[in-house]
Regions:
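Acidic, Ser/Thr/Pro-rich beta/coil linker or hinge segments at domain junctions
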Residues: 1-3, 14, 30, 280-323
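Extreme N-terminal cap/leader segments of soluble proteins
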Residues: 1-67, 89, 98, 116-127, ...
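Beta-strand->loop->alpha-helix junctions that form or flank phosphate-binding loops
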Residues: 37-40, 132, 232-243, 274-301
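Glycine-rich anion-binding loops of enzyme active sites
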Residues: 54-57, 62-64, 92-177, 289-291, ...
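Small-aliphatic-rich amphipathic alpha-helix that forms the alpha element of a beta-alpha
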Residues: 70-97, 113-121, 196-206, 219-225
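Short, compositionally biased
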Residues: 177-193
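Active-site-proximal betaalpha loop/short-helix elements
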Residues: 191-258
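Helix N-cap motif at beta-to-alpha junctions
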Residues: 264-271
Length: 323
């Protein structure tokens, strides 16, 4: 695939495009008047001071077409995306609540089954929520509470010029049937394996300067969010991004990863970070460098193109509120 086509298709990808409106919504809610809020918009979770601990709060909703297509997987993913958000911040998940909107009893039951399966898999309880049993639509949304400490807090907004960019992904998975952009690495693995993988970010957190889990915008879109939050640019060699054999490049770069992270660190910490990911069967490689400015550049087969220019483009992560 030519780089020009790749840039065009990623910029037009739904998971990327739908991030833009976040900026206007967040602008209406900033500034936050609380001395206990340490970081908010632009991060995977809000960061709240609570005594000696740091609390993490996040929420995610599931795309309506996924709820219609596969309600069990929608419920499962509603939990998965939240525990990944907490892990990406260097945190440990505590508990979740949900808002379930569905008038069809069978669909509702499948969504709940999916949530329960994921709660059991990741070891995070669902402790309450709210039900709309009479809506004209079906939707599931989950909010999560996590915790960490200051030495292990990983922000999206900490990347600095010259630092290596590391993509880390569990390549042992499969695309969910009927959901071509959902790379499932957790449903068929034991709870011991997936929980060990989630703990990896907490282990390496003191060595990272920034991090995000690879989510709906895909690998490059997620990195774009991190860079926008950090106020930086980058150069990335697409050919170095870990990818399973036989998987289409565009499909892979726009996939939601069951277990995938993009992180930055000091150059001296690179081997330590990559080796720690490897201990949890997560393949990690240096694929680029953080640069000064606002331009996100890609390289492939001798060609070089601009994917995003954050002086003009937004993925809903600028500026994050850090107090």
């Amino acid at each position: 695939m030519k780089l020009e086509e790749l840039v065009r298709d990623i910029r037009a990808y739904r998971g990327v495009v739908r991030k833009g409106p976040i900026t206007n919504v967040a602008a209406g809610l900033i500034p936050i008047q609380s001395e206990d809020v340490l970081a908010a918009y632009g991060e995977d979770a809000a960061v709240i001071k609570c005594g000696r601990e740091i609390l993490l709060m996040a929420a995610d909703g599931i795309l309506q077409d996924l709820v219609h297509r596969n309600p069990f997987w929608a419920g499962y993913c509603a939990v998965l995306v939240n525990v990944n958000d907490i892990a990406a911040m260097g945190g440990q998940s505590i508990a979740m609540v949900n808002v379930l909107s569905c008038s069809h009893e069978e669909v509702r039951a499948r969504i709940v089954e999916g949530m329960r399966a994921a709660c059991d898999k990741f070891g995070v309880p669902m402790v309450g929520g709210h039900l709309h049993p009479d809506t004209t639509y079906s939707a599931v949304d989950v909010a999560i509470l996590g915790k960490t400490d200051r030495s292990r807090l990983v922000l999206s907004s900490g990347a600095d010029v010259g630092e290596p960019i590391i993509f880390a992904t569990d390549l042992d998975g499969q695309f969910t049937e009927g959901v071509p952009y959902s790379w499932d690495t957790t449903s068929k693995k034991s709870k011991e394996v997936v929980r060990r993988q989630l703990r990896t970010m907490n282990k390496i957190a003191p060595y990272l300067t920034a991090g995000k889990d690879i989510s709906n915008p895909g690998a490059l879109g997620t990195l774009g969010m991190l860079l926008e939050a950090s106020g930086k640019g980058c150069v990335v060699d697409v050919s170095k991004i870990p990818r399973p054999k036989g998987v289409d490049l565009l499909q892979w770069l726009t996939a939601y990863q069951g277990c995938g992270f993009v992180v930055t660190c000091r150059e001296a910490r690179t081997k330590l970070v990559i080796d720690e990911f490897a201990r949890s069967d997560i393949t990690a490689e240096v694929c680029g460098t953080v640069t000064k400015g606002s331009v996100f550049e890609l390289e492939l087969d001798g060609d070089k193109r601009v994917l995003f220019d954050f002086s003009k483009d937004t993925l809903g992560c600028a500026p994050p509120q850090k107090l």
